[in-house]
């Protein structure tokens, strides 16, 4: 049996500090303590003694335990004794009573295999079967036969017992059997610890790394323990070391020595919102091969000049295939989707060149874009006065030409981005659409509505003159009165007008009189059917009334 080592925490049946307790689990009791006892192997701590628990009363057993910690549970190794020589039943009788098995035996498993059996015993004082039950309980741990066969040359068979006393009758689940803490037992702890070994904490030496060549072990630095004398020598030798030569760093003029890659890099005041004068502006990104300088013209915030928005058209076949691109992609990203939809509509229609008689001069349009809104109105008024009376009357009767001339003025009046392609507006005009689509001016439905409106007003000439006059007044550029009159809303109106043209164009080639006649016939037929249905209902009501009255007369007779 192994004894406790001198430096162990368990000495003389006690632990060297409070809180340490012997509280093993069922698996630990069977697989370590009981198995090692049967196989005669060494135990690290001698805490369980060999005692025959059936030869003593329960009150005498705590004094026989090797644990003197004050805990209220004790452990013992007991050789298995037989009640009868050729029987497997143990003799559990004592001098003043007996231990009786109670409850159900529990199997102890380890690694999914059965390694032992746990049995609960209760002590009865007196002779069976009229003994008096006490609060002394004992757990018996035995090893399984298969697990016992794993031991080599077992000499003697033991059973392990755990003894404790309950606080009263009935089950006491969760009851603690540890020793209560007594402060008086640990007051003279320092005086009693005479054999304590003083543990000297070693000082951490200062390690110095010296440069060394590579050796076979492939270590580049060799650690060398540095003593205090060496440190003093090093500190004393520092003032004698040659000093570092003081070198004056020459002063350098950054303007002369440093070269800058920036153009026109000179000290000046930062002025925001600057634009070079007489510089051609375009939405297309430009790649300049040489650097030019020009005076700066400063503008007010949130103001865009007409020159910044105007594009000089380039005639070619590509004008109908790609839309205008902006140089600053982050400035007009919100209008790219609508602009693409507008170009898709223009791509679906055929383009044809504009006649010289009906088209405006391109040079005059580009020059007029440089004028202000007041100058443009004055120019239009002069052009209107210079015309002959016949041309003035034609322009009033057909305001489409006047509207075409001032469309660009309305579109560019607001300080927003251009939402349509100027190349398409200058290079060609919309031709007559294919079958199924007709222009808005040739729509028969619109002509019929216009005729009906003229009849209601009492005269076609006066109504047409007033409508043309109102169209001319509406075309005069002015500040929008509400958000719905902005350029973005007009863009949606123009885009939606194409869908209206296609919808109204489905009635191409169909006379309006035929449609009106069909509607009148349908209305008359519906009215006739309603009258016939009402007459039939009245007839059936009369017939039913006559039948009922006839039956009542027959019953009276």
From Swiss-Prot:
Name its GO BP terms in alphabetical order. Answer: cellular response to hydrogen peroxide; leaf senescence; mitochondria-nucleus signaling pathway; positive regulation of DNA-templated transcription
GO MF terms, alphabetically ordered: DNA-binding transcription factor activity; transcription cis-regulatory region binding
Task: Please provide an example of a Pfam family that matches this protein in its UniProt record.
Answer: NAM
Q: In which tissues is it expressed?
A: Expressed in roots, rosette leaves, cauline leaves, shoot apex, stems and flowers.
What topology does the record note for this protein and the membrane?
A: Single-pass membrane protein
Which species is listed as the source? Arabidopsis thaliana (Mouse-ear cress)
**UniProt KW DNA-binding keyword:** yes
Keywords for this entry?
Activator, DNA-binding, Endoplasmic reticulum, Membrane, Nucleus, Stress response, Transcription, Transcription regulation, Transmembrane, Transmembrane helix
**Residue range(s) of DNA binding per entry:** 115-172
Instruction: Give a short account of what the protein does.
Output: Transcriptional activator activated by proteolytic cleavage through regulated intramembrane proteolysis (RIP). Transcriptional activator that acts as a positive regulator of AOX1A during mitochondrial dysfunction. Binds directly to AOX1A promoter. Mediates mitochondrial retrograde signaling.
Please give the name of this protein. NAC domain-containing protein 17
PROSITE patterns, alphabetically?
NAC
Domain of life of the organism encoding this protein: Eukaryota
InterPro entries assigned:
NAC-dom (IPR003441), NAC_dom_sf (IPR036093)
Induction description: By cold and drought stresses.
Q: Which SUPFAM superfamilies match?
A: NAC domain (SSF101941)
Q: Where are the transmembrane segments?
A: 526-546
- Sequence ranges assigned to domain NAC in this UniProt record: 16-166
Show the domain comment. Answer: The NAC domain includes a DNA binding domain and a dimerization domain.
Q: Where in the cell is it found?
A: Endoplasmic reticulum membrane; Nucleus
According to the UniProt record, one GO cellular component term is: nucleus
């Amino acid at each position: 049996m192994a004894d406790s080592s001198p430096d162990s925490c368990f000495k003389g049946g006690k632990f060297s500090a409070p809180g340490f307790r012997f509280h093993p689990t069922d698996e630990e009791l069977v697989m370590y303590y009981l198995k090692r006892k049967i196989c005669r192997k060494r135990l690290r701590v001698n805490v369980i003694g060999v005692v025959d628990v059936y030869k003593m009363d329960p009150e005498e057993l705590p004094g026989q335990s090797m644990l003197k910690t004050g805990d209220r549970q004790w452990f013992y190794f007991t050789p298995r004794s037989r009640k009868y020589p050729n029987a497997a039943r143990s003799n559990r009788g004592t001098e003043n009573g007996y231990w009786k098995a109670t409850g159900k035996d529990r199997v102890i498993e380890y690694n999914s295999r059965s390694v032992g059996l746990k049995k609960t015993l209760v002590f009865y004082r007196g002779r069976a079967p009229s003994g008096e039950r006490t609060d002394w309980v004992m757990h018996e741990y035995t090893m399984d036969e298969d697990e016992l066969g794993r031991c080599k040359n077992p000499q003697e068979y033991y059973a392990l017992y755990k003894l404790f006393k309950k606080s009263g009758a009935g089950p006491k689940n969760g009851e603690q059997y540890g020793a209560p803490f007594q402060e008086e037992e640990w007051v003279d702890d320092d005086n009693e610890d005479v054999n304590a070994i003083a543990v000297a904490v070693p000082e951490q030496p200062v390690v110095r790394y010296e440069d060394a060549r590579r050796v076979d072990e492939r270590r580049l630095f060799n650690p060398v323990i540095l003593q205090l004398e060496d440190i003093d020598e090093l500190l004393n030798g520092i003032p004698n070391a040659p000093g570092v030569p003081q070198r004056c760093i020459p002063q350098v003029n950054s303007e002369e020595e440093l070269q800058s890659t920036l153009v026109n890099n000179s000290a000046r005041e930062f002025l925001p919102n600057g634009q070079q004068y007489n510089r051609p502006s375009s939405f297309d990104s430009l790649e300049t091969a040489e650097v030019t300088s020009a005076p700066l013209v400063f503008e007010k915030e949130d103001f865009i000049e007409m020159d910044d928005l105007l594009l000089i058209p380039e005639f070619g076949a590509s004008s109908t295939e790609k839309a205008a691109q902006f140089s600053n992609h982050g400035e007009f990203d919100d209008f790219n989707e609508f602009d693409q939809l507008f170009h898709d509509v223009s791509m679906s229609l055929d383009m044809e060149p504009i006649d010289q008689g009906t088209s405006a001069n391109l040079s005059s349009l580009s020059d007029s874009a440089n004028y202000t809104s007041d100058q443009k109105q004055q120019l239009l008024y002069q052009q209107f006065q210079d015309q002959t009376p016949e041309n003035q009357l034609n322009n009033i009767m057909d305001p489409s030409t006047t509207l075409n001339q001032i469309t660009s003025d309305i579109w560019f009046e607001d300080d927003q981005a251009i939402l349509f392609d100027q190349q398409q507006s200058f290079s060609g005009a919309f031709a007559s659409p294919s079958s199924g689509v007709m222009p808005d001016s040739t729509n028969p439905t619109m002509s019929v509505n216009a005729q009906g409106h003229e009849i209601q007003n009492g005269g076609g000439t006066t109504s047409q003159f007033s409508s043309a006059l109102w169209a001319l007044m509406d075309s005069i550029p002015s500040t929008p009165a509400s958000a719905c009159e902005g350029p973005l809303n007009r863009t949606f109106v123009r885009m939606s007008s194409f869908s209206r043209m296609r919808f109204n164009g489905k009635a191409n080639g169909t006379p309006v009189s035929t449609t009106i006649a069909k509607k009148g016939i349908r209305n008359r037929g519906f009215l006739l059917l309603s009258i016939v249905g009402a007459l039939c209902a009245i007839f059936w009501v009369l017939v039913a009334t006559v039948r009922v009255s006839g039956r009542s007369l027959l019953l009276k007779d």
